[in-house]
Amino acid sequence: RPVSSYAAAYRKGQGLREHAECHRDHKLLVKVDIHDFFGSISWMQVYQKAFPWYLFPPSVRNLLTNLCCFREALPQGAPTSPAISNLVMASFDESMGAWCEKRQIAYTRYCDDMTFSGEFDPGMVIRKVSAFLEQMGMSLNRKKTGVYTRGSRQEVTGLTVNERVQVPAAYRKKL
């Protein structure tokens, strides 16, 4: 399967609710963001991961990669970038997912937003994510890293996941 089951964005049949559901009613929730996500996906990563040698001859790989990249990176806003980002991130998702499963941590990635939930040391998870991203030439956006306990409002892609998945109370009151 070329796109990881841990990737929740840009996939048919996957929505915000499905993404949020696996993080429902956990003791701890950690959210991290990849800094300059699309701009951090290099021409070479697109060439190797989106257009693999066993499916495309070199000339076709080169042409397709050149069509999908701008200034040696995946451009934000291009219609092809979301699907390609999932192909490039598949090995990351599988490695991160396997690491998390061994520790009974739920993991999903929605574009550049990663969510972890369960009972664990948040620092350990953040360090591991950072190390995995570094191997790919990427880094965390530390300003968007958040740790949320059960006593606080835990949100995943705009949905509250404390006891059940629902839109936040403030939004419901506006309706």
What are these regions (language model features)?
Residues 160-164:
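Active-site proximal helix-loop segment of RNase H-like, two-metal nucleases, encompassing DDE(D)
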Residues 1-36:
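Active-site-proximal segment of RNA-dependent polymerases
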Residues 22-111, 115-151, 159, 169-173:
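Conserved polymerase palm-domain catalytic core
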Residues 155:
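Short acidic/His-enriched helical or mixed secondary-structure segments at domain edges of catalytic enzymes
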